[in-house]
């Protein structure tokens, strides 16, 4: 007897996650919805490096050293790896509260603040938390229905609370937070070195060619080199400046969001409770500390009730799994009767027994 197995589509948690993120590769890749500038970043890096490897590297490897394209390839691969790691990873999104958790938090807030008279503004929903003998305020997020952890903030573009939120970077197409900040820093650092490297050797290439055929003839014969020089010149200042700014933040163990708001350098002159007072310790904590795991569980499987589908009943399941074919027959002995008799059309009724001979003679 053949049995047909019916498989239903599994609903994973990333398909039902709130927010404005997009997912690819069955939830393994997580990005923001606005990815146009990210594609521009890829185009500029890939286009500039392709021209550099196709023209300048071939000439410089023969005239100067074959190590020039090797080192350029190492910088290029490292920059691309850190860019994709920053763009495709979870920056540290904090899950929103479930309905039961949100109701419990609301009851806790009402019990703490008391009843608010009608017409008056309710007090701010803030909890005080002490870190290194410093009072830190935990703010309530009305979208996620949670009290945000220290240094967390709600991104208005991705519509999620991100742990140790630094900023939303459209150039990488993702938020920069606790789980991908180190990769973001390594990306802009390696990109700065790559830009300086390509720009410098383009100048060397033009100088060497100008010694043979002249400066104007070199510019006419190598329009790709001119394009590379222009791209590197205009992007060099912004990338190198951004790297220097984030190096300053890493040394202080501070985020871009805290620097913009003036959390530790404002009028109140409150000391940064997260700084160790040592540049080396701060750099080790930000860039070399253990990477926390993602708390989203994007590829987890949702129950049928939460995925929006109705669980099949027992009768539906049995009828869908069993084949619609007649039951197998068994071989019976001549003196055995089957438990389930056939229909009247298939089995004729038995003939009445003949009366015995003695009863017939008595009647006569």
Swiss-Prot record:
Catalytic activity, EC: 2.3.1.225
Catalytic activity: L-cysteinyl-[protein] + hexadecanoyl-CoA = S-hexadecanoyl-L-cysteinyl-[protein] + CoA
Pfam family, one: DHHC
Molecular function GO terms recorded: palmitoyltransferase activity; protein-cysteine S-palmitoyltransferase activity; Ras palmitoyltransferase activity
Subcellular location: Endoplasmic reticulum membrane; Golgi apparatus membrane
Topological type in the membrane: Multi-pass membrane protein
Family indicated by similarity: Belongs to the DHHC palmitoyltransferase family. ERF2/ZDHHC9 subfamily.
Function: Palmitoyltransferase that catalyzes the addition of palmitate onto various protein substrates, such as ADRB2, GSDMD, HRAS, NRAS and CGAS. The ZDHHC9-GOLGA7 complex is a palmitoyltransferase specific for HRAS and NRAS. May have a palmitoyltransferase activity toward the beta-2 adrenergic receptor/ADRB2 and therefore regulate G protein-coupled receptor signaling. Acts as a regulator of innate immunity by catalyzing palmitoylation of CGAS, thereby promoting CGAS homodimerization and cyclic GMP-AMP synthase activity. (Microbial infection) Through a sequential action with ZDHHC20, rapidly and efficiently palmitoylates SARS coronavirus-2/SARS-CoV-2 spike protein following its synthesis in the endoplasmic reticulum (ER). In the infected cell, promotes spike biogenesis by protecting it from premature ER degradation, increases half-life and controls the lipid organization of its immediate membrane environment. Once the virus has formed, spike palmitoylation controls fusion with the target cell.
Protein name per the record: Palmitoyltransferase ZDHHC9
Provenance organism: Homo sapiens (Human)
